[in-house]
Amino acid sequence: MARLAAFDMDGTLLMPDHRLGDKTLSTLKRLHDRDITLTFATGRHVLEMRHLLGALSLDAFLITGNGTRIHSVEGEVLHRQDLDPDVADLVLHSTWETEASIHVFNDTGWLTGKEIPELLHAHVYSGFRYQLTDLRRIPAHSVTKICFCGDHDDLCRLRIQLNDALGNRAHLTFSAMDCLEVLPVGCNKGSALAVLSDHLGLTLQDCMAFGDAMNDREMLGSVGRGLIMGNAMPQLIAELSHLPVIGHCRNEAVSHFLTHWLDQPNLPYSPE
């Protein structure tokens, strides 16, 4: 029996309209009642996640910024990791051959240089939004992560440029087909979940986790039971081909799987 359950948000726990379904919320509360610790492992900012948890009346640990921060249920910072200032400075002050927009995250929030209203659709239920600023004036010593948003093929070409410039000084990952992230070295949801597990006196084998994108790869591959969404990025399914694939987030597949796991644990599971 898993003792810790970790959930990606967008494309996994949330439906395509970025809303948490009623069945999913009910199932999460059933897990809590079974003394299974909940953690949400997401690229979203902790300020946004705190608002969402408060609105849903859920108690959970938070792994935010794709592993750059871990917070306890009470809001205490358990772990923090920032980009190397030299890396942040290089990424923010270099000229890259890309049409992608650039976004900076630090403890104050989400910062970008121009209005991009379509990016706010994913945050409509929380009301979280970017702050407009001159990105070149942001202090490099306080950056948690930098994201590029745009066309996937363009981002793939950008990844080559970034990799050539940064080498092993940063971790690059796709959190969605249209979002490439620059993270601190060794920083990912899997490494953060290992820190949290140790804090709770557990091991990763005591965990189950759900995800859909390449930023979930380390987490899904390291836990006792990793489950991939049916709507996952093809690259993730290919790299973790040994893991089971459940249903689509639009059908609240996480809730469907967990209801079966709670009620009929000895019977084979089918996502249909």
From Swiss-Prot:
The active site is at D8. Signal peptide: none annotated. Its cofactor is Mg(2+). It catalyses: 4-amino-2-methyl-5-(diphosphooxymethyl)pyrimidine + H2O = 4-amino-2-methyl-5-(phosphooxymethyl)pyrimidine + phosphate + H(+). Its EC number is 3.6.1.-. It comes from the Bacteria. One of its GO terms (molecular function) is phosphatase activity. Mg(2+) binds at D8, D10, D212. Keywords: Hydrolase, Magnesium, Metal-binding. CDD domains: HAD_Pase. It is an enzyme of class 3 (hydrolase). Belongs to the HAD-like hydrolase superfamily. Cof family. Catalyzes the hydrolysis of 4-amino-2-methyl-5-hydroxymethylpyrimidine pyrophosphate (HMP-PP) to 4-amino-2-methyl-5-hydroxymethylpyrimidine phosphate (HMP-P). This is HMP-PP phosphatase. It comes from Enterobacter sp. (strain 638).
